[in-house]
């Protein structure tokens, strides 16, 4: 079992989004993630939360964004109850992983995410 944590300053995300718009989001989010974020009442917090969650997942993997894992190798989506989950882009993305659990929280200044990976 491994854990990863990341925290993101909302101001940093807001400045980049205001400067580059959707092009900024397309660098690290899938189209489905972008649509979800833009529908949320707190757009910047939603973007920052997904950014932090992706960072937390690769930290838990122990690889960072390398070894074939890229920003768009997986998406951070929400189930019907609103809980975030990891959706791999393809079945081979996390071959040795059992369950990947994530939690995302944010306040006025930052978003934080935790990822827990259970290995097979």
From Swiss-Prot:
It comes from the Bacteria. It is found in: Cytoplasm. The keyword rRNA-binding does not apply. It catalyses: apo-[ACP] + CoA = holo-[ACP] + adenosine 3',5'-bisphosphate + H(+). One of its GO terms (molecular function) is magnesium ion binding. GO terms for cellular component: cytoplasm. The keyword Nucleus does not apply. It is an enzyme of class 2 (transferase). Signal peptide: none annotated. Mg(2+) binds at residues 6, 55. Keywords: Cytoplasm, Fatty acid biosynthesis, Fatty acid metabolism, Lipid biosynthesis, Lipid metabolism, Magnesium, Metal-binding, Transferase. Its main location: cytoplasm. Gene3D superfamilies: 4'-phosphopantetheinyl transferase domain (3.90.470.20). InterPro entries: 4-PPantetheinyl_Trfase_dom, 4-PPantetheinyl_Trfase_dom_sf, ACPS, Ppantetheine-prot_Trfase_dom. Its EC number is 2.7.8.7. Its cofactor is Mg(2+). GO terms for biological process: fatty acid biosynthetic process. Coiled coil: none annotated. Belongs to the P-Pant transferase superfamily. AcpS family. Transfers the 4'-phosphopantetheine moiety from coenzyme A to a Ser of acyl-carrier-protein. This is Holo-[acyl-carrier-protein] synthase.
